[in-house]
Swiss-Prot record:
One of its GO terms (molecular function) is ATP-dependent DNA damage sensor activity. The gene is mutS. This protein is involved in the repair of mismatches in DNA. It is possible that it carries out the mismatch recognition step. This protein has a weak ATPase activity. Keywords: ATP-binding, DNA damage, DNA repair, DNA-binding, Nucleotide-binding. This is DNA mismatch repair protein MutS. ATP binds at G658, P659, N660, M661, G662, G663, K664, S665. The lineage of its organism: Bacteria, Pseudomonadati, Pseudomonadota, Alphaproteobacteria, Hyphomicrobiales. HAMAP family: MutS.
């Protein structure tokens, strides 16, 4: 597209002296008008082959994108800042802006410049915003991570009772879900889905009760008018979007759920403007169907990302062997929302077991899956007008792979989940598949405007236009040969120039043959007489010239019509295409978990309705793989049995003591991760595992402060511990590490002691509790379901060897000084720490300042280093003098003991 020359205004106009009033050009007036309607977005304003930004937008975008900031014209006596990005590279720049939290309004030219000129020489090309690009409404391949969903979430709330619900949509795949929530669960439910954007009513956005949750989410939270969330008008909005007369086939939704659905759909309509992404019907999630994992637990267990935000090092990365984008997204969904129904879990485990038993079929199917493109995302791009020929090609390749996979499994006796998936794959639209094969070329361009994507022979007119476009010389030469034969003039030529176009040229001597008869005169039309030649044309040649001139445009027009035809057909089959793509993702996840189990030596867990938790030879899935990559010592497997000690009883609590670096935190985490893997339907890193379904998982492992909210490490620890003690029930699994370490020793011990008693008596849940407060091991005599276990170590020549083995019993020390030495603390600090430890253990916690400075121990180290070194050899040494002055026969027992300590001190100062 091109802009009219007058849009920028004349140089003279835009560089008028500052003293004179400067009138904005028509183009800039149009820009300001459009920008006024999109104040919360950067405006990408189409100018020919560029998107340009002006004023504050230009300043912000140039800084965010690292592009040159220039100027164009003046406004109110000031230069107008301007920057721009090429249209062909716009996706790359959009990606950077969205990642930095910006919203972008894309403003396109909506008419041809020639049309604008018809309205007058100074008319401006019409422009309009065709789309708002926001973090939650992305569809372009470059803007999306193939392994992650891109959810837009809306929160609905009803007036009066304030009931809450969440609806979340991935418009790139059509996924649409809804669930009720509560203020207590809101943060956890939002973080489980992990949306890229959260849309809320402006009234809720400023609600003092909910605002802290929005701050914690840390995502793009977008307030919208409350009218968009009106549950009373929601049914009409849903019916209009899905083009149905009634919602009877959608199931029953509560008022807050309708409010959330309405808000989500309204926001999609607002951002997509004229386009309507095809969505699945909203699927209702029922409370309790998935394992509740609060945000702190999700973060500390590093399920999808590590604490530093990286995918590498997470559980998801460790277990991911998928080969398709859809499979990777389904695996992530299952891992972050494990099931709580043993029957449903068993169905998934049956699928993994089947692929383990049919390894040749598993390998053959995975080989086919590797070629499967992301069909749902390609379909969505086609539906909203952002697709290209390769998106149609992705459907064709996906159909082909689906057909092969269905054939591979046609006669197999499959478990239920895989059988349903095979049925969905087999139901692919065969007629449309054949249509795509006939229509699409083998090599497809990225953009439809490039043409060349329709296979030769599909459309006869297109073939003719291509022949004219690509073979015009051959066609002209053929026509010239016909004319030579007809006239007998061997020297006849068909030539071309910019004035006459194509013409027939003969020498003056041969011109008579072209004009001798009335028939010849009517056939060969005189165009021009030259000194030695005459030029003619024919109706046939004129038509051919017109066809050649228009052939390229006509060929592209035909191809675009074919593209629209195929796109419409694809959208009409959206449900069956998505069902097949979902089935392929199920195959991918099940097969990949089988590959993982075989590769890592995992076992099938037994998951039931009991309160058992018996893990034999369990391992940490992430740490074990890291050790293998480093060719280090193999991971040490450990048992964990929190099962009830009697029929009908509650689960047990293990109180874990042991040294720093002994592996306590790893042991705690691995058991939580094994529970998650089992309930997501995966084999687990253990010799055997029997797990009674866990309904809520709580983990308090690791320490960090919350500076943004003014909370210390200890305060964060107490808040998270309070949440656990207030919410855990008998079917919960609780993992607690070092509760009470962030405060004074006796305060911390008291809190930890009381917390264990509460878990045992009130929550009555299965729990692992690690501590350095060895006094707590006495609780095993008081609490019948509590057992002491410890991490084994071996001491050797003042060093400690960590065996990383869990054994029954209690530790009597933590080996902190040895660990400090291993960490590289200065030797003086280590020695002083050892002395202080000995004195504390001996009960000598009071004395002179240079003997033990409780509050400032490092200053004591400095004092120790600065003292002059005592002489210990020779007759004049301090130690020799002290010994020589002793009168053994005159010493009382008490004086002798005091003297021994004095001599030891002198020796130590040496």
């Amino acid at each position: 597209m091109e802009t009219t020359a007058n849009e920028h205004g004349s140089e003279a106009e835009e560089n008028t002296a500052e003293a004179a009033p400067v009138r904005l050009t028509p183009m800039m007036e149009q820009y300001i008008e459009i920008k006024a309607a999109n104040v919360d977005s950067l405006l990408f304003y189409r100018m020919g082959d560029f998107y340009e930004l002006f004023f504050d937008d230009a300043v912000e975008a140039s800084a965010a994108l690292g592009i040159t900031l220039t100027k164009r014209g003046k406004h109110l006596g000031e230069d107008i800042p301007m920057c721009g990005v090429p249209v062909h590279a716009a996706d790359d720049y959009l990606q950077k802006l969205i990642a930095k939290g910006y919203r972008v309004a894309v403003c396109e030219q909506v008419e041809d410049p020639a049309e604008a000129k018809k309205r007058g020489s100074k008319s401006v090309v019409k422009r309009d915003v065709i789309r708002l690009v926001t973090p939650g409404t992305l569809t372009e391949e470059k803007l999306l991570d193939p392994s992650e969903a891109n959810f837009l979430m809306a929160m609905g709330r009803t007036r009066g009772d304030g009931a809450l619900a969440l609806a979340w949509i991935d418009i790139s795949t059509g996924t649409f879900r809804v669930a009720e929530t509560t203020p207590d669960r809101l943060f956890a439910d939002v973080m489980r889905v992990d949306p890229r954007e959260l849309v809320v009513a402006d009234s809720a956005f400023h609600d003092e009760e909910l605002r802290p949750v929005f701050d914690l989410v840390g995502k793009a939270v977008t307030p919208q008018p409350a009218t968009l969330f009106d549950s009373a008008a929601a049914e009409t909005r849903i019916q209009r979007y899905f083009n149905v007369a009634t919602l009877d086939g959608f199931g029953q939704f509560s008022r807050p759920e309708l409010s959330a659905i309405s808000g989500a759909i309204a926001y999609i309509e607002k951002t997509q403007i004229s386009e309507r992404p095809p969505l699945m019907r909203p699927e209702r999630e029922h409370e309790g169907g998935t394992l509740f994992i609060d945000p702190a637990t999700r973060a500390s267990l590093e399920l999808a990302r590590t604490m530093s935000g990286n995918r590498d090092g997470s559980l998801l990365k460790a277990v991911d062997r998928t080969v398709t984008g859809g499979g990777a997204r389904l695996l992530a969904e299952r891992l972050t929302a494990p099931l709580t129904n043993p029957k449903e879990i068993a169905l998934r485990l049956d699928s993994v077991s089947w692929f383990l038993s049919e390894q040749s079929l598993c390998e053959a199917m995975r080989a086919e899956l590797k070629g499967v493109p992301d069909m749902p995302r390609g379909l969505s791009r086609l539906a909203v007008g952002r697709g290209g020929p390769r998106d149609l090609g992705s459907l064709a390749r996906g159909f082909e792979a689906a057909h092969v996979i269905a054939s591979l499994l046609e006669s197999a006796l499959l478990p239920d989940e895989l059988a349903h998936a095979r049925d969905a794959v087999s139901a692919m639209p065969a007629i449309f598949t054949a249509h795509l094969d006939r229509a699409l070329a083998d090599e497809l361009p990225l953009l439809k405007r490039d043409g060349g994507f329709v296979r030769g022979g599909y459309n006869s007119e297109l073939d003719e236009m291509r022949a004219l476009r690509d073979q015009s010389r051959r066609v002209i030469a053929g026509l010239q040969a016909n004319y030579i034969e007809e006239t007998g003039i061997k020297s006849l030529k068909i030539k071309h120039n910019n004035v006459l176009g194509y013409f027939i040229e003969v020498t003056a001597n041969n011109a008579g043959a072209m004009t001798d008869t009335d028939e010849a005169k009517s056939r060969f039309i005189h165009r021009q007489t030259m000194a030695n030649a005459m030029r003619f044309t024919t109706t046939e040649l004129a038509e051919l010239e017109s066809k050649i001139a228009n052939a390229a445009d006509r060929a592209l027009s035909i191809e675009l019509a074919v593209f629209e035809e195929l796109t419409a057909e694809a959208v009409s089959h959206a449900d069956s295409i998505r069902a097949a793509a979902s089935a392929l993702a199920v195959f991918d996840v099940s097969a990949s978990l089988a590959v993982l189990a075989e590769e890592q030596g995992y076992c099938r867990p037994q998951v039931d309705d009991s309160l058992s938790f018996n893990i034999v030879a369990g391992r940490h899935p992430v740490v074990e793989q890291a050790l293998r990559r480093q060719a280090a010592n193999p991971f040490v497997a450990n048992d964990c049995d929190l099962s009830p000690q009697a029929d009908g009883g509650n689960g047990a609590i293990w109180l874990l003591t042991g040294p720093n670096m002994g592996g306590k935190s790893t042991f705690l985490r691995q058991n939580a991760l094994i529970a998650i893997m089992a309930q997501m339907g995966s084999f687990v890193p253990a010799g055997s595992a029997k797990i009674g379904v866990v309904d809520r998982l709580f983990s308090r492992v690791g320490a960090s402060d919350d500076l943004a909210r003014g909370r210390s490490t200890f305060m964060v620890e107490m808040v998270e511990t309070a949440a656990i003690l207030n919410q855990a029930g008998e079917r919960s699994l609780v993992i607690l590490d070092e509760i009470g370490r962030g405060t004074a020793t006796f305060d911390g011990l008291s809190i930890a002691w009381a917390a264990v008693e509460y878990l045992h008596e009130k929550n009555r849940c299965r729990a692992l509790f690690a501590t350095h407060f060895h006094e707590m091991t006495a609780l095993s005599e008081k609490l019948e379901r509590l057992s002491n276990v410890t991490m084994r170590v071996k001491e050797w020549d003042n060093d400690v060897v960590f065996l990383h083995e869990v054994a029954k019993g209690a530790a009597d020390r933590s080996y902190g000084v040895q660990v400090a030495r291993l960490a590289g603390l200065p030797e003086a600090v280590v020695n002083r720490a050892r002395d202080v430890l000995h004195q504390l253990e001996a009960g000598e916690t009071s004395g002179k300042a240079d003997k033990l400075i409780d509050d400032l121990p490092l200053f004591s180290v400095v004092l120790q280093q600065e003292k002059p070194k005592l002489q210990v050899q020779g007759k004049d040494s301090d130690l020799t003098k002290a010994v020589s002055a002793i009168s053994p026969d005159e010493l009382t027992p008490r004086e002798a003991l005091d003297l021994i300590y004095k001599l030891k001190e002198l020796a130590g100062r040496a």
